[in-house]
Amino acid sequence: MRQKMILALALGGMLSAQAQHVQESNFCSPFDFPILLSANFGELRPNHFHNGLDIKTQGVTGKPIHCIADGYVSRVAVLHGGYGQAIYVTHPNGLTSVYGHVISFAKNIQACVRQYQYAHETFVCDLKFQPGQFPVKKGDIIALSGNEGASAGPHLHLELRRTETGEYIDPMPYFKHLLKDSKAPVGSLIGIYPIQGKGVVNGVSHKKLLAIGNLKQPVHAWGEIYTGISAKDYMDGTSNFYGVHSVTLYVDSVQVFNSTTDKVLPDENRMINGFTDYEELTRTRRLIMRSYKFPGNRLRLLHANENRGAVTINEERDYHFRYVLEDNFGNRRTYQFIVKGKRQDIPEYKPEANEMLYWNRTNVIQKPGMELVVPRYYVYEDVPLRTDMRGDSSLIAFDYILDAGRTPIHSYCDLSIGLRHMPVADTTKYYIVQKAGKWRSSMGGKYANGWIKTRVRSLGTFSVDVDTIAPQITPIGQGGWRTSRNIRFRIKDMESGIGSYKVYIDGKFVLFGLKKGILVIQDPENVKKGVPHKLEVTVTDQCGNMTRKEYKF
């Protein structure tokens, strides 16, 4: 009882401190119009949680973005993917706000970025600034909203991070007064999972999925099981759906599991693959949140009982399960179902594999001419691994099969494959390829002492290939370049992938961005209209093969 009281007091203190911090921060809206969200913090995504709020920009780009509080611009990043263009503002309260997918920065910052890009002849850049360089006040316009990088439509991606650790924290408590939400989360599916070799559901060792509308369907289990739920949240004023902030599971009125998405460290992002049913996601695209914590999953937002969320069914009686779903605004929905304890045989677990990946140790998997190193905690539970090698002595390298089924790997693992033959003397032309049927994808790689070495974070079939084919360059709308100055190229490489590119007009470097394989001029106003020009474009792939073309317009 005393421990429960101490825990309650501690939680109360933490919540009070957080509420005080929110009140003291007093952030303003980044926009001068009423805001709606297209995504919330913690929304489940492939391989990561959504780390901020996506704010709608009324379907257009170019909306002025206001700094949410006093501070200074500490960083500006320009990428082809990801956030595209992002601006970071460090605040005196220990937080940094991040504004992603912007189309441009405030004039003084934009000029600094452009100066760097032209001086270094590069589009991609990551610039850090000191406190006195670009101070900003609450409400200052720091950028214009856009659709840059990996964005599916115009919006602002707004993050809050702890300045010292880089930890992502949920911005919703700071901005919920600007939003309206009277809608409770909605579940769609319940999963009941037997732990293989220790439990059984309806006579088999496979999961049982129940639609929310079919929860009265009889389910019989014995031994150790756990459950999961698929659910979405909704808000007023939009048709979008969002991630569920808090999921709590009770069994016979005792809490056995809770997940609350209020903070995530960068290294925890891919641990989402141990929280969700990764096999179901990759096979059907359905997102089911497990109410179970694998032994190797260190994700802090998961809170489980001493059995990591597992429930032992060892009596022939009804076990009462109850899910409580809650959003940031206190809207709550409950789902209840019964699992009937029924004594039944539990099949022995016999994985069809010749190797194992253990979650709590470094795994070194070797075959003749191949080595894979999977560090500790890079799988979330012990995983069967089927290994094999195929091919004949005439190949550059054997095909190596590293089959762990639909199992996620936490981060990059070292993979080395030895060369059996070198049809091309230039060692920079070799790369490791992952393949499945007709699908092939370059994993990159560097040559060292007869081996090609790279890093991979998914398993499958790997080999070595050679790339001596240069990239392709195709002009788009060349006939209108002189008048429109909308200069674009389609570039692609079928082997190792695009490595770099540069464009010069009349002998001077011109800035181009790359999105979805299209090179697009960034400063068309720098190209004089209506006069002849000579353009030179070079594209180099990851193995150093280069294509150079000249155009007159």
Where are these regions (language model features)?
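Surface-exposed, glycine-biased beta-strand/turn segments
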Residues: A19-S97, I103-F105, T122-G132, K137-K138, ...
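Conserved structural position at the C-terminal beta-strand
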Residues: A231, L325, V537-V539
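Short edge beta-strand/loop segments characteristic of extracellular beta-sandwich folds
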Residues: G228-K232, S416-R420, N486-M494
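Exoplasmic/lumenal beta-rich domain surfaces
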Residues: T96-P131, H206-K216, G243, Y250-V311, ...
